């Protein structure tokens, strides 16, 4: 899959974050990213099919454990993130501006370990 350059991004191949397969758990309303980390996750559109989140994680900030259903994240800038999973394992991930990433619906905490604020759009699938 290729991202088409329509908003000033260089086309970038998509990726699937390779999270630990035993790290996830079903999402509950108690671990909704918007409720757990309202300073970082804002709903910008919601309908029967999707919920779109504007994500801004300040440099050095860390979210509590939360979940997303199956989702696509689009990076609006270069990012270095540390994901921690319920099983205690963690993974550092470098993402590039314009990169689209498939998230297969699991729980995690995220820490911005980069040199600037993280800005992304997350499209959560409801169906």
Model-derived features: positions:
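A short glycine-rich, His/Asp/Glu-containing loop-to-beta-strand
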Residues: 37-64, 69-73, 122-123
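Histidine-centered metal-chelating micro-motifs
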Residues: 60-63, 100-111
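Glycine- and acidic-residue-biased ligand/ion/polar-headgroup-sensing regions
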Residues: 68-87
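Ligand-binding loop in jelly-roll beta-barrel domains
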Residues: 78, 105-126
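Short acidic-glycine-tyrosine-enriched beta hairpin
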Residues: 89-104
């Amino acid at each position: 899959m290729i991202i088409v350059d329509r908003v000033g991004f260089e086309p970038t191949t998509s990726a699937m974050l390779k999270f630990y397969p035993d790290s996830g758990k079903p999402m509950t309303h108690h671990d909704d990213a918007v409720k757990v980390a309202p300073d970082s996750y804002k709903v910008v559109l919601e309908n029967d099919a999707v919920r779109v989140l504007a994500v801004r994680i300040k440099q050095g900030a860390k979210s509590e454990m939360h979940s997303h259903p199956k989702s696509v994240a689009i990076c609006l800038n270069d990012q270095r993130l540390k994901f921690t999973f319920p099983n205690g394992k963690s993974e550092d991930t470098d993402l590039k501006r314009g990169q689209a990433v498939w998230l297969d619906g699991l729980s995690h905490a995220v820490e911005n370990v980069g040199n600037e604020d993280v800005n992304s759009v997350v499209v959560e699938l409801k169906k």
